[in-house]
Amino acid sequence: TTDGAGCCLTACAQRGDMRLIAVVLGCGEDPERFDKAEELLDYGFSGFERFTPEQDSRRLLPITVERGEVSEVRPMIKSIGDCIIKKGRSGSVKYEYTFVEKLEAPVEKGQFLGEFLVTLDGNEVFCSEIVARDEVRRMSFGMYFLRILGELITF
């Protein structure tokens, strides 16, 4: 409580697998701020739910790497976490996968390859980087020569 902010309260509550935090600023005396915090928490628990985005492995196909010792690298979503969405809206969630247009060796493990974006009604609810699962070294001149020679022989 301060003169500028008035009576304030931070409250935390957990129901099932969801934990919420309510912050109340500028309230009157004790009963009011506790009532407002309880009201906010009840609103959150009654109207929202925890949601875990699902990654589609069919969208995470290997990406071509130019001038690499291997010709492609496997992408992966860096982290998947939960988010909070309005109850009953999980069927309206949209997933977007964007990738870099061109990839040239060397590629480091964990290097940024794109973005995994989850939206609901046009609003972002979750975002994570798509990164390289493994490293890809740059092809040496000798290896490049042998690869071309091998292609000529099999032609």
Question: Which ranges hold each PLM region?
Answer:
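Domain-terminus/edge residues, biased toward the C-terminal soluble/receptor-binding domains
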Residues: 1-155
